[in-house]
Regions:
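A short, basic N-terminal segment
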Residues: 1-36, 186-201
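Amphipathic alpha-helical "lid/sensor" segments that cap RecA-like P-loop NTPase cores
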Residues: 163-201
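Sensor-1/coupling segment of RecA-like P-loop NTPase cores
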Residues: 104-143
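Conserved small helical "lid"/interfacial subdomain of P-loop NTPases
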Residues: 138-164
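P-loop NTPase Walker A phosphate-binding motif
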Residues: 50-65
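AAA+/P-loop NTPase substrate/partner-engagement loops
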Residues: 62-91
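Walker A/P-loop nucleotide-binding motif
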Residues: 35-54
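Conserved P-loop NTPase "ATPase switch" module shared by AAA+ and STAND
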Residues: 71, 87-109
């Protein structure tokens, strides 16, 4: 199978949307307002924190606000000086600073960034643990959610054929949906999805 035809290719995974109803979005935005637009999206690895942050930024943009995104990689204890300068330059009340992976920052870097972001109208971060800011949303995963995502990617019939494997994948990757979907990409790339058990299953 060509990589671009794989139903679990990166571009198809990125096209998935966070599972939140219109009413859920209204409640989330109302809570963000109650928290003074300074809050954290919390959850384990692969639970959709980045996706929710990106979609929240897009929603805020439709409300006339300007989302300013900073993404921190694993082990990045402080943002690159040029990235930090670009993020914080000219911040005003209409800007909302979004920091993906804020818990990667060391205490001094986090304190400095938080102070600098006071000029902005908001600060929303993602973190694996609570405590950086009041919690806006806690992301979680389940086998049912994994099955729902797989159904969207491959269709109901094929997803049903995969269903017996999904619990094993979910457990193997400790609930990390991103890792589970990556494993399905490898499986589809190697052979038809319905052929034989998962390696190690």
């Amino acid at each position: 199978m060509r990589a671009r035809d794989n139903p679990f290719a990166v571009h198809r995974i990125h096209a998935l949307r966070f599972r939140l109803t219109d009413e859920g979005w209204r409640e989330l935005l109302a809570r963000l307002s109650t928290l003074g637009c300074r809050a954290a999206i919390v959850g384990p690895e692969g639970s959709g924190k980045t996706l929710l942050l990106e979609e929240l930024g897009a929603r805020l943009g439709t409300l006339g606000l300007a989302p300013c995104l900073l993404t921190l990689r694993r082990g990045e204890r402080r943002p690159a000086p040029e990235a930090r300068a670009a993020l914080l330059a000219g911040l005003g009340p209409a800007d909302v600073v979004l920091v993906d992976g804020a818990d990667e920052l060391g205490p001094l870097a986090w304190s400095s960034l938080r102070r600098a972001a006071r000029k902005a109208g908001g600060l929303v971060v993602t973190s694996h643990r609570p405590g950086l800011l009041p919690t806006l949303w806690t992301c979680g995963t389940s086998v049912e959610l994994l099955a729902d995502l797989v159904r969207e990617l491959v269709g109901s019939e094929e997803a049903e054929a995969l269903r017996p494997r999904l619990a094993a994948l979910f457990d193997r990757h400790r609930g990390d949906l991103r890792a589970a979907l990556r494993a399905l990409y490898d499986l589809y790339g190697a052979s038809p999805a319905t052929a034989g058990p998962l390696p190690g299953a």
